[in-house]
Amino acid sequence: RYISVTGVQTCALPISAALKAADAVKKRIAWVVLQKIKGTPMDDVAECPPVDDKVLTMDEFEFKNSEVLHKPTSKIFTFVEALKMAYFNRMSLGEYAHFKTEGLGYDKAKGVGTPFKYFTNGVAASEVELDTFTGELKVLRTDILMDLGRSLNPGIDHGQVSGAFVQAMGWVTSEKLYHNKDGKLLSHSPTTYKIPNVQDTPRIFKIDFIENNGNTANVHRSKAVGEPPFLLGVSVWTAIKDALKYKSGKAIPQIISPATPEVVLMELAKYDSQL
């Protein structure tokens, strides 16, 4: 969905590289529109000059509702018209920019500072069922709660969270690497390296978001959601350990990851030998 320019500009901290690049393109479009309003023949202009406050006053322009408004003259151009003017007058509509997050620093000795501009937090609870004869696992239910600030697209964020969780679930339950004595990887294909499929996903899978406006460091007060939910998949591994503890009646076992059916059966065999 479209995020209004006014909403983006409410970020108190410097904009990202993408927004910096977009801002440069906006200035070029505004400059071309201004030449059109002034009636300047574009053949007399070799190229768009470096656009700064001396050349162009961006406050005179408003980009909104797919239109470009020049406030002093009240002239309005559709966004398509403005783009065509820029394109056919050989103005670049592409740009790149670099951005370095400001205000970061951390004193390891004192344990104080700001190592990251913001944190993406989440919590997950998983319920599992173990087959004591085969060591196979079923994830009966998983509930996830994520803090993503103000979500730009809840549908995409939901997919990111669920995908990262399932990926991590496979990482801690089935994705085991095998090497021969020479160090050559043997589990190098789907036939030897088991990744989770749709049947491995939680039978009940609920994901919810906490929406807040506290993150001023990112676009539209949103938060990144690529990798952070991956760590929540560890809840499946810890649930397996709790299930084994219930079976043994003793302390939580120190099993390895991934907790494959073989690992589970070997742990269960220890309990049988102790009976």
Locations of regions flagged by a protein language model:
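Single conserved hydrophobic/aromatic residue that forms the stacking wall/gate
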Residues: 1-11
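C-terminal catalytic domains of large/alpha subunits in multi-subunit enzymes
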Residues: 12, 16-275
